[in-house]
Amino acid sequence: MEPAAEKREAEQEELQQQHDEPAVPSADDDEAEAEENERRNRELKAGFHPLRRRFVLWYTRRTPGARSQSYEDNIKKIVDFSTVESFWVCYCHLTRPVSLPSPTDLHLFKEGIRPLWEDPANRSGGKWIIRFKKTVSGRFWEDLVLVLVGDQLDYSDDVCGVVLSVRFNEDILSVWNRNASDHQAVMTLRDSIKRHLKLPHSYLMEYKPHDASLRDNSSYRNTWLRG
């Protein structure tokens, strides 16, 4: 077997290992859940339709060729929302992917999670990656946003957020999850994404753990799994 093939096989075996023990709910988790329940009750009384979680939309616009720019410094919060009504107000005012400059990223994440590899919620996780022609990316992005906000993905508690990356020749959608070593959760999430987006069989999905992205300083190169 060639060294490159051996490396890929070893990486995939590493991804399939499940070392993490089940998380034990903490007092902070209980407090956060109580706050969420209180928030939903307030919104119901006000006549709104509360989402299960509050979400934050972030925007990144990097200047081509400006390598000295800090990625974290470039991430700007646009808005947050927690009801169906506030979501649609926000979404209807967003610029559509076809009109966004390259390179640009839109990040829709659960409140409390920043769209950074180093964030505590993301550090042990990874992302599923799907590449689209620019002519069709807008429809799939909208479907993915609705699936996330509607809490429809399998292993939804393991999902951190979704990203639209507008590039010169293509647009890329990615779904970030918390635990790259939980092979069952990773593969079930892949199947759930395919099902909800109604992806044609010709579309290839790639997976990359965030620690690998940190090592090679790249979001979308050198992916581990394909399927």
From Swiss-Prot:
GO terms assigned for molecular function: RNA 7-methylguanosine cap binding; translation initiation factor activity
Could you confirm whether the keyword Protein biosynthesis appears in this record?
yes
Per the record, the domain of life is Eukaryota
| Stretch list, region Disordered | 1-43
* Bias kind Acidic residues: ranges: 27-36
Keyword set for this entry?
A: Initiation factor, Protein biosynthesis, RNA-binding, Translation regulation
Q: Where is the composition biased (Basic and acidic residues)?
A: 1-22
This protein's name: Eukaryotic translation initiation factor NCBP
Q: Name the gene that codes for it.
A: NCBP
